[in-house]
């Protein structure tokens, strides 16, 4: 075996372009550094929002479905307003506060998100703040015939805005995957009907933005799934697959049907103030998707 004449790691780095630090003249201590963001002047416009986006961070969620508590990964957007006389914000404070909440066992709920958003505005010394987070939510599901258990999932989201004059506004959301079977295909065909995976996205606001004993994730999930041709399952054996196939055939749905039926459930929920429903089907006989949307406010 041949042995190479091997340079040291320092020499290797030098050979590949690394250079020693420059003996600079600018200060290295925070107290001596210029703070451009805090230099007051007339900067022409106030900003609606400024901050950080696409921040991945672990967080805890609770649910009325098993597992009742789980750690997931949230994707956060943290922003605040900015006054005309301020050049910028101290963005490091945004992730500092998120880490502080994480260390205390931050549970993602509407109530806790309101507290976090208000703290964010105060920490940043701004009159408003906005927090948006999306996260995967996992829940146990049994197959329809043999009761085989597996973990299904949906994409959940929380939006909270705080304004020191107007107070809080909020919106919750969920995207659930379902099966939709085409009513037209069933009607015109001697046998069978094309079906596909559909994605139902619901956004809702409540009269009272507290979860209490109700889990908004479950509320939105049931509104979407209970109106589909069939729901999706992580584990299916042959008897289960037969049950799923037949149920879908018995409950054909257009995208138009899905948004209207889902909206009817949301309308009947007395805690919900306003909502938007979208259904997007990945058409199995086309290269395009089918889509329908509906918005309603009970004001």
From Swiss-Prot:
Pfam family of the protein (one): GCHY-1
Biological process terms in GO annotation: tetrahydrofolate biosynthetic process
Transmembrane feature ranges: none
Segments of this protein annotated with the region Disordered: 1-25
This protein's UniProt keywords: Hydrolase
Pathway(s) served: Cofactor biosynthesis; 7,8-dihydroneopterin triphosphate biosynthesis; 7,8-dihydroneopterin triphosphate from GTP: step 1/1
Residue(s) at site: May be catalytically important: 182
Coiled coil: none
Family: Belongs to the GTP cyclohydrolase IV family.
NCBIfam families cross-referenced by the UniProt entry: PRK13674.1-1
Stated name of the protein: GTP cyclohydrolase FolE2
Species assigned in the record: Halalkalibacterium halodurans (strain ATCC BAA-125 / DSM 18197 / FERM 7344 / JCM 9153 / C-125) (Bacillus halodurans)
Gene (name only): folE2
């Amino acid at each position: 075996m041949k042995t190479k004449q091997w340079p040291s790691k320092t020499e290797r780095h030098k050979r590949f372009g690394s250079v020693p630090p420059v003996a600079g003249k600018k200060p290295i201590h925070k107290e001596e550094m210029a703070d451009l963001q805090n230099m007051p002047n007339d900067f022409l416009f106030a900003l609606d929002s400024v901050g950080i986006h696409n921040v991945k961070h672990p967080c805890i969620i609770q649910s009325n479905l098993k597992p009742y508590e789980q750690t997931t990964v949230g994707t956060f957007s943290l922003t605040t307003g900015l006054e005309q006389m301020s050049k910028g914000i101290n963005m490091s404070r945004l992730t500092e506060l998120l880490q502080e909440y994480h260390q205390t066992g931050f549970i993602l709920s509407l109530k806790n998100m309101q507290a976090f958003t208000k703290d964010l505005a105060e920490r940043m010394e701004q009159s408003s703040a906005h927090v948006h987070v999306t996260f995967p939510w996992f829940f146990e599901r049994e197959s329809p015939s043999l009761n085989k258990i597996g973990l299904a999932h949906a994409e959940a989201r929380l939006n909270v805005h705080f304004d020191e004059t107007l107070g809080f506004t909020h919106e919750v959301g969920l995207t659930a995957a379902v099966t939709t079977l085409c009513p037209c295909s069933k009607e015109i065909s001697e046998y069978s009907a094309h079906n596909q995976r559909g994605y139902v996205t619901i956004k809702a606001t409540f009269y009272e933005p507290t979860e209490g004993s109700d889990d908004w994730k479950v509320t939105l999930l049931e509104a979407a799934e209970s109106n589909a041709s069939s729901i999706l399952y992580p584990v299916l054996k042959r008897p289960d697959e037969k049950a799923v196939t037949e149920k879908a055939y018995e409950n054909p749905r257009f995208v138009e049907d899905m948004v209207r039926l889902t909206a009817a459930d949301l309308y009947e929920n007395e805690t919900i103030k306003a909502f938007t429903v979208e259904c997007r089907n990945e058409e199995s006989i086309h290269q395009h998707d089918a889509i329908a949307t509906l918005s309603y406010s009970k004001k």
